[in-house]
Swiss-Prot record:
The keyword Magnesium applies. Its EC number is 2.7.7.89, 2.7.7.42. Involved in the regulation of glutamine synthetase GlnA, a key enzyme in the process to assimilate ammonia. When cellular nitrogen levels are high, the C-terminal adenylyl transferase (AT) inactivates GlnA by covalent transfer of an adenylyl group from ATP to specific tyrosine residue of GlnA, thus reducing its activity. Conversely, when nitrogen levels are low, the N-terminal adenylyl removase (AR) activates GlnA by removing the adenylyl group by phosphorolysis, increasing its activity. Keywords: ATP-binding, Magnesium, Multifunctional enzyme, Nucleotide-binding, Nucleotidyltransferase, Transferase. Belongs to the GlnE family. Residues 450-947 are annotated as: Adenylyl transferase. It comes from Salmonella arizonae (strain ATCC BAA-731 / CDC346-86 / RSK2980). Signal peptide: none annotated. This is Bifunctional glutamine synthetase adenylyltransferase/adenylyl-removing enzyme. Residues 1-440 are annotated as: Adenylyl removase. Its cofactor is Mg(2+). The gene is glnE.
Length: 947
């Protein structure tokens, strides 16, 4: 055992003052002194439970004691009679064993590989013990879940990630997936439940037993987001549902996650064998699959961007050469060749490294270095976390904890530890780059830059000076450019730029100027880029990104030249620079139906309980996707319709995630309304109106939303803080509004307008579906029925969606007096024009003026309300383009007119998109779009001017 260093001997005196009664400095062994000095977690635990210290002093922890965990826990739970006492015993048992593991680890009494095994067995023992106790309790209450043949059905739990691999770290979340074999009902209970309901309730109670903080702490933070469909999917799935999902919808990243999946408490029974056999083909392909390398490279890029976004430094898990890169190296071989090589199918990393050596897939020396680095990094990670039982992989900045880690890693001091760490991580990084690499080299050779460009940047030539590299510019442009450079350098003098930042900037700027000054619009482009550079000069990471990745710099210049809106976004949110690294994704937005899944994967990296990080992640994802959509728009790869489609799908993914987050927060506080006990879903819907409802969102569009529920009047919630069910939905809607509008360092998510709800701003924020139907039928104005034409459910249960669709269809197919409707629609349009019309009389407001977009929308809405009672098919779509198609198909409007209005509509909307990209208002010269305006005005007179 390494003697305590001087700082630790000094700290021991603080420890002595806190020792539990009955223990003195002289009565403790040297081992106890060392552990209690090293770990505040161990010290706090034995102060609360002195008998644990006596137990450790009399009998040190053993390497194989994990074999006794199940028996010890069974004894601890013998007298448990309710959920509260179960939760207490689970927490005390976990803490007691964790102190024993911390003791053995700090003193190196047990090998590091065995420590990982002990931590994983402890978690598995607690999960299985809690499940079995709660399963029996639920069976007593509701009966035993059985299939149609009367065979009892178990709850199977997949442990994912390091838990599944038997490599859990000291303070870790646990990633779980719940499954049960076959559908059926419970038998022998006081009331019969569907198996899905039984296992959902059991799963909820199990999560609460493990995850909910009490005065005794918690057992483990439980993360269920790896299950199919994430938080929006069922908590527990049948085998059939699991199989369907992974066969038809399983993503690459889910396949990688499933490599480590292991059934908790697996006793190799028929159900366990069936589940394993079902999942194996999804994970391990029969053919050699080299697409894995690019997929893993993409995942690594996502992690590198996350490190930059969160400002993570000294992170031994996610940093270059860290634990995650070793895991990626091993997964490459598992996923490429695992289908053909059973020895590569191990869930654990170290046995897989042995197989890689045996199969000669990597040089033996590389594998030796990876093994040594992995064990070194995992020991360092566990020691770091055992100091305070805290989930962290970031090296400490304070002297005490650095001294603790140096002692725990058997080094003389902190610099010696850092030296060893640096060597191990460099070895890992080398193997990683050779195998997976990045799309561009980490350190590309410095381009040869001519001396004149350095002169332009570093010497700040005077306006009268001449240099050949600027000779192609007109005199005024040259003066403007040199003034911009001089002003930028003056601005930099006010910033606290360190030596490294200055060095990188001096490498970057000559290259940037070389590219910018080759453009005709050099001064304009530079004026858009310098605010961004001024914002990141103190964040060397982003300067290095632009310096080391010439492609990223090229795309930055091109996009800023094309759009001041993009330049402004990049200046406000520099984290978006990461998106410039991969042109393959930059100019190809996410598939319209994949936004939800991309967002779900993105949010998995953020702790579920960290609301602040969740809010930031949502905003960062939205900004990154907006950048990609705008880049594709500028490049001409997206039509105006496709731009709006992408913006709308993105907004819907955001709504989905915000509702999920708000729901989880509300249920944690109040439980859920009891009318949901007997059914699936949440009894809640979000209806999109206006541009969202009509699939016509622009870059800066608000969201027009209303909220519906189907909660009966007398329902309460089932949580410890019981509230009225309808009050629950009101607070849910308020929470959703809050999550959208909260301003973080990444801005707000969307401006949300809920004034289209029944009775407008004076009405309730959330309305029951029945009240909504009654309002629409008996109180709503014609303009509210017009708004309903462009409305659709963007989030909600199928039951509520059907209810809303039926109300909408009923209202729209109601027979109306043509003259009255014509007058009311026309008068509403005139009223709008007087309030919103263009204040610049010499300009044409594309949206609000006569012959503009709003006129086309009113024509479409009028014709649907006028003729839907005769042609119900007119109610099918909520977007103007398809409504115009329906009007032609149903003989209301001739095909030529419908096509002409569609072309005018898309042309005007395209112009609005491009004006937004240029940060210009939505009006143009009066001479513009005269053909389109004349056509729209003629159509307006035809349909809406009284004869």
């Amino acid at each position: 055992m390494t003697p305590l260093s001087s700082p630790l001997r000094q700290y021991w005196q603080t420890v002595v003052e806190r020792l539990p009664e009955g223990f003195t400095e002289t009565s403790l062994s040297a081992q106890a002194k060392s552990v209690l000095t090293f770990s505040d977690f161990a010290l706090d635990s034995v102060i609360a439970h002195p008998e644990w210290l006596a137990e450790l002093e009399s009998a040190s922890p053993q390497a194989d004691e994990w074999r006794h965990y199940a028996g010890w826990l069974q004894e601890a739970l013998a007298d448990v009679c309710d959920d509260a006492s179960l939760m207490r015993e689970l927490r005390l048992f976990r803490r007691r064993i964790m102190v024993r593991i911390a003791w053995a680890q700090a003193l190196s009494r047990v090998e590091d590989e065995t420590i990982l095994q002990q931590l994983s067995h402890l978690a598995e023992t607690l999960i299985v013990g809690a499940r079995d106790w709660l399963y029996a309790a639920c069976c007593r209450e509701w009966g035993t879940p059985c299939n149609p043949q009367g065979v009892p059905q178990p709850l199977l739990i997949l442990g994912m990630g390091k838990l599944g691999g038997g490599e859990l770290n000291f303070s870790s979340d646990i990633d779980l997936i719940f499954a049960w074999p076959e559908h059926g009902t419970t038998q022998g209970g006081r009331r019969e439940l569907d198996n899905a309901q039984f296992f959902t309730r059991l799963g909820q109670r199990l999560i609460k037993a493990l995850d909910q903080p009490t005065m005794d702490g918690f057992v483990y933070r439980v993360d269920m987001r790896l299950r199919p469909f994430g938080d929006s999917g069922p908590l527990v799935l049948s085998f059939a549902a699991l199989e369907d999902y992974y066969q038809e919808q399983g993503r690459d990243w889910e396949r990688y996650a499933m490599v480590k999946a292991r059934i908790m408490g697996d006793n190799n029974d028929a159900w366990s064998r069936e589940l394993r056999a079902m999942l194996r083909p999804f994970v391990f392909r029969r053919y050699i699959d080299f697409s894995v390398i690019q997929s893993l490279r993409n995942m690594k890029g996502m992690i590198a961007r996350e490190v930059r976004r969160r400002g993570l430094k000294d992170n031994i898990k996610l940093g270059a050469g860290g634990i995650r890169e070793i895991e990626f190296i091993v997964q490459v071989f598992q996923l490429i060749r695992g289908g053909r090589e059973p020895s590569l199918q191990s869930r654990s990393l170290l046995p897989t490294l042995n197989a890689i050596t045996a199969l000669h897939l990597l040089p033996e020396n590389d594998v030796t270095q990876l093994r040594a680095a992995y064990l070194f990094l995992r020991r360092l990670e566990n020691l770091l976390q055992s100091i305070n039982d805290e989930q962290t992989q970031t090296l400490p900045a304070d002297d005490l904890n650095r001294a603790r880690l140096a002692w725990g890693m058997n080094t003389d001091n902190w610099p010696q530890l850092v030296g060893k760490l640096t060597e191990h991580m460099a070895n890992v990084r080398r193997v990683f780059n050779e195998l997976i690499g990045d799309d561009e080299a980490d350190t590309p050779q410095e381009e040869e830059l001519s001396e004149p460009w350095r002169e332009v940047w570093q010497d700040t030539l005077q306006e009268g000076d001449s240099t050949p590299v600027l000779a192609h510019l007109a005199d005024e442009d040259r003066r403007q450019l040199l003034t911009l450079i001089a002003d930028f350098r003056k601005e930099l003098d006010k910033r606290p730029i360190g030596p490294r930042g200055r060095q990188v900037l001096d490498q970057l700027m000559p290259r940037l100027l070389d590219d910018v000054c080759s453009r005709e619009d050099a001064a304009v482009t530079l004026s858009r880029i310098t605010p961004l550079l001024a914002g990141i000069v103190t964040r060397t990471t982003y300067l290095e990104l632009l310096s080391e990745f010439p492609g990223a710099l090229k795309h930055l210049i091109m996009l800023c030249a094309a759009s001041p809106m993009i330049a402004s976004q990049l200046a406000r949110y520099p984290l978006l620079l990461d998106e410039l690294l991969d042109p393959g994704t930059l100019y190809q937005p996410t598939a319209t139906n994949a936004y939800r899944d991309e967002l779900r994967q993105y949010l998995l990296r953020v702790p579920e309980e960290d609301e602040e990080q969740q809010l930031e992640a949502l905003r960062q994802f939205k900004q990154a996707q907006l950048l990609r959509i705008a880049a594709a728009d500028i490049a001409g790869t997206l039509s105006v319709m496709k731009v709006s489609d992408h913006l709308t799908w993105l907004a819907e993914a955001m709504i989905d995630a915000v509702v999920q987050q708000a729901w989880m927060q509300m249920v944690a506080r109040y439980g859920q309304p009891t009318h949901l006990d007997e059914r699936q879903g949440r009894g809640f819907a979000v209806v999109g109106y206006g541009k969202l409802g009509g699939w016509e969102l622009g870059y800066s569009s608000d969201l027009d939303l209303i909220f519906l529920h189907d909660c009966p009047i007398d329902v309460m919630t089932n949580g410890e803080r019981e509230i009225d069910g309808r009050q629950f939905y009101l607070r849910l809607a308020q929470r959703i509004m809050h999550l959208f509008s909260t301003r973080t360092s990444s801005g707000i998510l969307y401006e949300v307008d809920a004034r289209l709800r029944p009775s407008g701003a004076a009405g309730m924020l959330v309305t029951s579906a029945d009240a909504f139907a009654d309002y629409q039928q008996h109180e709503a104005w014609t303009w509210e029925h017009q708004a309903l034409v462009r409305a659709r459910v963007v989030y909600g249960d199928p039951q509520l969606t059907s209810q809303f669709d039926a109300v909408r269809r009923t209202i729209m197919t109601t027979a109306r007096d043509g003259k009255t409707l014509q007058t009311e629609v026309r008068e509403m349009r005139e009223k709008m024009r007087s309030h919103l019309g263009n204040k610049h009389r010499d300009r044409f407001d594309i949206k609000a003026d006569e012959g503009g977009i709003t006129d086309i929308e009113f024509i479409a809405q009028y014709l649907v309300l006028r003729y839907a009672h005769e042609k119900p098919k007119l109610t099918r779509w909520s977007d103007n383009v398809r409504i115009l198609e329906l009007l032609a198909q149903n003989g209301i409007m001739d095909e030529h007119e419908a096509q002409a209005l569609t072309v005018a509509y898309t042309t005007l909307r395209d112009e609005l998109h491009h004006l937004a990209l240029q940060e210009l208002p939505g009006h143009v010269a009066q001479t513009c779009f005269s053909k389109e305006r004349a056509l729209v005005q003629a159509s307006w007179r035809k349909w809406l001017v009284a004869v």
